[in-house]
Amino acid sequence: MMASRLTVGITTRNRPGALATCLASLAGIRHLVGEVVVFDDGSEPPADGKGDARLIRDPSSPGYIVGRNRLVREATTDLVLLLDDDTRVIDASAIERAVEVISGDDRVGAIAFAQAEADGRPWPVTLQPSRAARPSVIPSFIGFAHLLRRELFLRLGGYREEFIYYGEEKDFCLRLLDAGYRTVYLPDALVGHVPDAAGRSRSRYLRYVVRNDCLNAFYNDPLPRVLWTLPARFLLYFRMRHGWRIHDPWGWLWIARDVLAYAGRTRDRRRPVSRASIRLWVELKKAPRPYA
């Protein structure tokens, strides 16, 4: 039995069935878990934490990014496993291995898991955090399931809550990389992900992905890089909208207004990472580094 204890934090909104399945799946890692905390993002009717889970409810529905920050702050353990409500632990050894890696190497700031069907079949490699076939250092995890160091996460400021939905992982992992830490991907550490359609909107997803990529560039990219990365990321909206066949003719205007508004109000929060960190991020995206 492993000595390390962790907090499992789950964000949920209007998915009672998925949440119940996720909570039930934690039975296999009971020996690792010190506590389970659920953030209810304004579900109607309110979510039921069930069992020993501690429930935190915010009826204002501020978004899952705010929820994740709250979960990490509320955690009472050094390690925090954050899960979406439509995930499920299908292999206890995946979580055990992740805890072993992050506990054994002070340079590791986060662990990325591989996405799988409920029966354990891995998702296509194009939908994974990386194409790497062995444990590797990569730029970023995917937020559906990830393991963090609580103290480090809070020291770096956590997720930017103005992102609201989507893209917060890349922004955080870039700051983590700039602070000298690494994100390690374990391709054999599978976590079930059974996306629930409740509350999903393709046009909202597109808007927030592009908006937050623009804000990521604004906050983190050094000069002169930001002068071309910010407009380039904005223009991706049109390519993505066409490629995904999403009818959202005025989404670009919403994005432009929102980015300009946030840039004007929060320009004092701009903290560009080093050029060396940008180079390393690009290198890891092209060629993940094997992690031994």
Show where each model-derived region lies.
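N-proximal low-complexity "stem/linker" segments adjacent to membrane-targeting elements
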Residues: 1-25
